[in-house]
Amino acid sequence: MGQTNDFPVRDKRKAGDEDKGVLMDEKVMLGHGSGGSMMKRIIDEVFYEAYGNDELLQGNDAAVLPAPKPGERLAFSTDSFVVTPQFFPGGNIGRLAICGTVNDVATSGARPLYLSCGFILEEGYPMADLKRICSTMAETAREAGVRLVTGDTKVVNRGHGDGVFINTAGVGVVPEGVSLGGEQCKPGDKVPVRGTLGDPGITVMSCREGLSFSADLLSDAAPLNHLIAKVLALGPNTRFLRHPEPRRVATT
């Protein structure tokens, strides 16, 4: 998941420590993004272990994927995630990274198939937290029925990041005959909404600011592609779908 790093490697370790296993101190180091043996180990022991598959394990610079059938179209979307805190009731930044892009692709009427994932890690980030995030991402990808097939990793100096940033991009196939878009909306159309408005945003904010509420708050982040497929199967009356960002329902 990545070949190069623009930052100099300045790990304060003794000669020979690398051969003993770079994950022994359970912290992300600059060398994990250098493109050398340290990067190979974090790829093997964290990323491949969490969501290795045939395409990813080939280790090529790009994943080569099947072309869509005649009449089908590709849907392509990308999103970046910079949530603080990274862990909150109902999920973590890894679940958001999978669900966000899967849902962005699905709302175009597409069947999401493949994802890429790019990590920007801060030096000193706990390896246990990174493994936990990757495990959640793998679990959520299985839930959505998609595969992580390519990725990249970079490490920035301590103090130049917020622990972990994640970018995911997704590709899906739009079946022949499916066409959704805001230009198709008409006056009088009904706008159904899934779930309780505001749950994801207020859950993260309450954790970040130390707020307490009488009700138990949980982020309801979930891959919606299977639900969307059922909605579209009901008939041609669905004109437009949107996956609003947290705290942005009004502007959507």
Q: Where do the PLM segments sit?
A:
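Helix-biased detector of long, well-ordered alpha-helical tracts
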Residues: G2-T252
